[in-house]
UniProtKB/Swiss-Prot annotation:
The keyword Nucleotide-binding does not apply. GO terms for cellular component: virion component. Residues 531-556 are annotated as: Disordered. This is Structural protein ORF43. Belongs to the ascovirus HvAV ORF146 family. It comes from the Viruses. The lineage of its organism: Viruses, Varidnaviria, Bamfordvirae, Nucleocytoviricota, Megaviricetes. Keywords: Virion. Pfam families: DUF5757. Its main location: virion. It is found in: Virion.
Amino acid sequence: MTIKRNGYNEYISMSSNSSPLLLYDIISLTNGSNDNEIIINFRSHVLNSNIIELLSGAAPHYFDVRNILVRNMESQKIGASFTINSITFVSEYMQYFVLNGNENLPNVYIDERGVVAYRKVWRRFTLGSPMFVFDYDGKLVKFTIAVERAKEGITVSSILHTRVRILDANSEDDIAFISEAIVTMMIYYKNSELEISQYYAENLYDELPRVRVLRDSKRIRNKTARRIRTTSINDIRTVIPVNNYARQCNRLPMLVDSIDDVPTELRGNTIKFPLHGEGGIDKPKYVYCRYSDAPYPGMMVNNLAGASKKFPYLPCCYKTSQEVKDVNLAYSRDVMPEVSSVAPNRVQIYFNTQRLLPCNSFGRSPMCIEKFITGINYFDDRLHDDDDNDSVSEYYPTISKVTDDVNASTYYCIRGGVQKGPNSIIEAVLRSLQYLDGRDPRTLSITDSILNSERLKLRDCINVSAQELYDIPFDKRLDILSSTQTYLDGFRFVKALQYQYDVNIYIYSRNCGPVTRFIYNHNEISLKFEDNDNINKQQQQQRERNDDDDDDDDSTLVLPYHNKSSAYIDTKIHRKSIVIYIHHGTEATTNATGYPHVEYIMFRKHKKVVEKLWDVYKAMLPVNITNVYGLSYYEADNDDINETISKRVAENCRKKLYVSTGKLLKLVGENNDGDDDDSFIPKLQVLDRLGKCVQLDEYRISSLSDFIEPLPLPIVNENMFYNNPSCLTQCYGFDAAFKVDRLSRLLLYITLYEMTLTGSITSVYFTINRQRFSELICDSGCVGKLLNNGCVTLQKYTHHLVSRTTTTTTTISPSISQEDHENNIDDSNITYILVDSSDTAKRLKYNATLLIKRMTAKEIDNLKLSTHVLPLLRYERDFALSNTSHDNMVVVTSMDKFTTKSFDHRYIYKIPSTIIPNIGESLVLITNESKEQTELVTVTSIENFTRIHDHYENSDAIQFKCVVNVWSGASTWKKSV
C-alpha cells in the first residue's frame, strides 16, 4: 500500500500481483476524524469483503480499479462518488434486473416517482434514469449510477466506465459497506446482461422499438418547443417552419389571417404571402412590419438550407420601400419564377475594424485613405461623374451598411479580403483587376495552384524589379520566385507585378516593412523583415509631413524598397491603377505565419482617386540630383563612348517596348513622344549597381543625373551583382572592380573635399565666380564634355555652380559667354561644388560621411595623392597633407581643440561650422606674427568682416598672416604676408 499526495488531495493505491485493485481519492472528511483512521477503516471493510473472490471467480475481467470520493453533506450526511472501470450497463436492462430481484442482491429499490414523465418534445412516454434506494438496516440511502467516459487528467478518453454517486449516507462505515454492495450488484448484473438482452429482443422489439434504448451513454435532455399561439396574430415562424430564419432576416415580420388584425396605422404597408400555395398554405395571409426603423415588408430569396425548395422566397422587413425591387416584382407574377432567374440578394458582409478580412468579404479601409478622399474634395459634385465604374453598384455594400454618422467617407472606399498565404499579393491584384473590369471581385475563383502558376510567370520579367532587388544576386532572385511557399514581398516585387498585369500599383502599409534579408538554408528561404522601430519612426515622420495628428491609424502611402542614398524612378506609365494594403491585422487576427498579409482597396469613384494619388506619389519620389552624389556606380571599360542617347529617347524606347508586348500606356496618344523617330525597340540593357538602366543596346544614356527604369530585357552586366553587394556606398578607389567615368569621379572628389572640410552649406550665401567657372570648364575637358554631350545646358550648369574665391567675389548671370571659358588662372587655392539647395548639401555631407567611414587606409592614401582631393576629416582625427601645396593646413575638429591647442603662426586653423554655437555668429582667428599672439573676432555679416579686414590690412602696428573662414557661408578671405 502506498500513500501519495497530489496537490490538496491524497489517495491510496492497493496492488495485488502488480495489478491495481482499489484506488481511493479522499477529498474531504468528517469533523474530528483522522486521515489514517479513515484509510484503515476503508481498507479493513474492503479487504474483508468477498470482492476479491468475485474478481478471481465469476467475472474477473469486468472490474479493475475503483475510485471513491468522499464529501461532506448538509445535515450531518456524507456523500461519495466512485467509478467502476470496464463495466457499463443499459438503463432499461438495469431497471429490469433490479425490479425482478435476486437472492444474492442487497435490498435495492427504484424510486419510481421520477422515472415516468410526459415530455412535449417526444409526445410519448419514456423511461428516464432512475434514482436507486439502498435499504441498510432500516436506513434508506439514495444513489445513482450512470455510464461516463473516463478522464485522463484533462483529456477525455474513449473508454467507458460506470459512475456511482452515493447521496446521503450517515457515516464512513455506511459508505464503505454500500459501495461494496453496489460493486457486487454490478458484477451480478453484468453476468445477466446477455440473458436480459435476449428477452427484450424476443418480446419487446418489432419494426420500431417500443422502448427507447440509449446504450452506454447519458440521455440528452431536449429543450421544450416554443408555445404555439392560438390567436390570429402570429409570429411568422409559427406558420413558416424555416430553421435559422432570423440569420438571413434580422427583422422578422408579423403574419395575420385578416387585414383587420393589422394595426390601423400599418395597413398601408402590407403584402400577401404566400401567393403560390407554398408550404401547403392555400389562403394567402397578410404580412406587416412593426419596426419603426424597418417598416416596409418585402420579399427575399431563401438561401437557407433545408427549406429553400418548400419556400423559395421569404418575407422580411426593410428600411426602404421594396415595391420596385426585382425580387418583389418577380414574386408578384401569376406564376412563381425560378430563383435562378432573379438577381440574387446582396449579402452585406462588412467588417468595421482593421482585422484581417475573410476571403470574399469587405471591410473598412485604412483611416488615412478616408482622410485622403476627404482632402481631395471627393464629395464635390464635379467628381461624381457617370463615366466612372458604375457597375460597382451591383455588389458594392449599401451606404446604410457602411457609413457611420461621423465619417461618410467610409462609404466611398472599402477593403476587400483575400485568402491568407504567401501569394496574397497576387490574389489581391487579380481581384482588383476583376473589379476594374466592372465585375464582382468575389466571384473570381482562385486556388493555390493558380497563384503558384502566376508567381512562376514573374520570373520572365524579374529584371524590371532591379531597383528593388539591387542587393540580391541575379540567381537568388529567381530562387525566391521559384519557392512558392516563400512570402512574396510587395515592397520587392511590385514592379514585376506591374509589368505582368499591366497596371500601376500603389502600396499602403501599416506597421509593415520590406524583407531586408533572404537567408538561404538548403531548399528553404528564411526572411528577415525591417525593424518595427524603424518602420514606426518613418511612418511617424510621414504623418508629420502630412500634418496628421491621428495616432490610431499608422497606415501610410509608401515607396517600394530601394537604396536610400539614390533616387528612385517610378513613372507609373500603365493606363490602369490599383491600390493594395499590406498589414498584419489586429492582435486577434494576426497572421500566424509571421509575414504580412495583402488586401486590395476599392473606390466608389476609382479614376478620380488614383489621379490625385499619383500627384501625391510623385512628390514622395527622391529628386534626381542625388544620382550625382549617391555613389551610383556602373561598369564602364571605356569612358569615351561616343554613341549616346538622351533620356527622352530612352523613355520612348521603353514605351515602344511596352506597347509591342500589348501593354496599355496612359501616355500613348496624349503626346508624340512615343512616335519619336530616334526611338527603337531595344534588346539588351546595362544597369548600374542600384538597378537603374544606363544603357540600351550599344547606346549609353548621356546624362549623369537622369536614368530610366529597368526594362524586362536581359542584363549585359548581370555579374556585377555578385561583387561586394553589401558595401554599396563604399569608395572603391583607383583599383576598384567597378570603374567610374572621369566626370563622375571628379564631382565625387570635389563633393568629398568640400563637405568634409567646411561642414554644412547654406546655399543662399554662395556666389558664382566667373573666372573660377572658366577654369573649371577647361579642367581636363570634363565639364566641356558634359556640355557638348547635351547632358545639361550652360545656363543650368552655372545655376548649380558654387565657387570659393580668394579676395573678391562676383556674381555672374547664367548667360555666360564662351570667351570667358578661355581665361586660365592659377586655381591652386580654389574649391568648388555643385549644389541646387541646402537640402542637397545636407545629403552630400551625409553621403560623404558614410563614404569616409567605409574607406580603408589604402584608399585614404590614394585619395591624398589625387590632384582633385584636398585634406579630409576622418573620425575627428587631425592630419595634414605632406605632398600638396597646402602642407601648412591643420583641421580643428572641435571648439575644445581650438581653444586648448598651442597656436603656431605657421598654420592656418579651420573651424567646422557645426561647432559654432550660434549660426548667426562666426569666429575668425587672427594671428599676430610680430607679437606672437592670437585674437578671436566675432563676425556677424559680410560688411562687418570687410571693415575688420580693412582695419587690420591698413594697420602698420599689426601684421597678420591669414584670416580664416567666415562660417556664415559668405566666402573665404585670405591675406598672405
